[in-house]
A protein has these predicted regions:
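Conserved N-terminal alpha-helix of the aminotransferase class I/II PLP-enzyme fold
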Residues: 2-47, 70-76
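Conserved PLP-anchoring active-site segment centered on the Schiff-base-forming lysine
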Residues: 53-69
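Active-site phosphate-binding strand-loop segment of PLP-dependent enzymes
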Residues: 93-153
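Conserved active-site segment immediately N-terminal to the catalytic lysine
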Residues: 160-172
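Active-site C-terminal subdomain of aminotransferase-like
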Residues: 172-262, 370
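PLP-dependent enzyme catalytic core of the Aspartate aminotransferase-like
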Residues: 315, 319-370
Length: 370
């Protein structure tokens, strides 16, 4: 990223962009169009909405945390009618509940479903394949739109095979690039709906960005240094191999869960997500009993050890913390983080089972033999 800017109209920048758009197809696992935006995840949410919806369209939001709800709030501000299929911060979306709601919508009034594959507030992972299967089984024409900000590049995502219509992500998590880039992918079905969408705006518009001139790909000057960084990050991912990347995330997530499982024996802290199969491989949300103050633990880890834990969000705010294990991360980083948390629990006399970090080490030692 520490390099001079180059000509944005011809030469290496053009071929670089072409390579990125093609490699984003590999990441989303789609033959559909891919788009690069100078934006964060919230920006690319808006890109997705404005390219396929019109004012007054009805949107169904699948609740499993905070971020699909935020996406729905954005749709409401754009003039859409928003309905929330109520869920829980502690469990995944139930595909059968989605199907039941769509079966009640005989006139296909619901135009889009908004769902997060992983909600970073709750730590819930949703089974997008099962949700898509449930939707298609109803025969409903609704578009399935997926927030993959906290999942793409960390776990399987099969856009075409599963039947996802629109998917979005950002640069700063699994794609290992500083914040500032957003990405969208669109199925042929979504592109057909796009042609009659009433919320289209010049900057986000897919048709404009498919223009022949390189200028069109970014609707102006590209954020070149971020684009250079993305190229390097994708090269790292493909060198490691996507299957190996996914395995690394599974192992480090399970090591984290082994530690928390031991700490939970003290009955003061534990997992937010109740079902083990619904706990994500990119972030783990930890909740504490009501009388336990978690801020001193967060402060201790940051101020004494330089480890920044994610604060709890949404309905969990002030009630816990989050440990991320996604993107450019390895065993020493995770084990070090777990060790610091365990130190903090001991220093602050927060009841916990002893040996959580050791349990994580033991798990990894068996999972990754010599």
């Amino acid at each position: 990223m520490h390099r001079p800017a180059v000509d944005i109209y011809s030469g290496p920048m053009v071929s670089l962009t072409d390579s990125l758009l093609a490699d984003l197809q590999k990441m989303f696992r789609t033959k559909g169009g891919t788009y690069i935006y100078a934006a964060n995840g919230h920006g690319v949410w808006e890109a997705a909405l404005t390219n396929v919806l019109s004012r007054g369209d009805k949107v169904l939001v699948l609740e499993s945390g905070r971020f699909a709800i935020h996406w729905g709030e954005q749709a409401k501000m754009l003039g859409c009618e928003v309905e929330v299929l109520e869920g829980d911060f502690r469990c995944a979306v139930r595909p059968e509940a989605v199907a039941a709601r769509l079966k009640q919508d005989g006139k296909n009034a619901i135009k889009a479903i908004l769902v997060a594959q992983i909600d970073t507030a709750s730590g819930v992972v949703n089974d997008i394949e099962a949700v898509c299967e449930a939707v298609r089984a109803t025969g409903h024409e609704v578009l399935v739109m997926v927030d993959a900000v906290a999942s793409l590049g960390c776990m399987p995502f099969e856009m075409d095979a599963w039947g996802v219509d629109v998917a979005i992500t950002g640069s700063q998590k699994g794609l290992m690039t500083p914040p500032g880039l957003g990405f969208a992918a669109a199925s042929p079905r979504a592109r057909a709906v796009h042609n009659k969408a009433g919320l289209r705006t010049p900057y986000w518009d897919w048709t404009f960005r498919e223009g022949e001139a390189h200028y069109h790909k970014y609707c102006g000057t590209p954020p070149q240094q971020l684009v250079f960084g993305l190229r390097a990050a994708l090269d790292m991912i493909f060198t490691e191999g996507l299957d190996n990347v996914f395995r690394r995330h599974r192992l480090l997530a399970e090591a984290t869960r082994r530690a928390i499982g031991v700490w939970a024996e003290g009955q003061a802290i534990g997992f937010n997500v109740t079902e083990p199969a619904e706990r994500s491989d990119t972030v783990t949300a930890v909740v504490a009993r009501e009388e336990i103050r978690v801020q001193p633990l967060i402060d201790y880890c940051a101020n004494q050890c330089g480890v920044v834990l994610g604060r709890a969000l949404g309905t969990l705010e002030g009630k816990g913390f989050r440990i991320a294990h996604m993107g450019h991360i390895n065993a020493p980083m995770v084990i070090g983080t777990l060790g610091v948390v365990e130190m903090g629990l001991s220093v602050l006399n927060i009841p916990h089972g002893k040996g959580g970090t050791a349990a994580a080490i033991d798990y990894l030692a068996k999972a990754v033999p010599a």
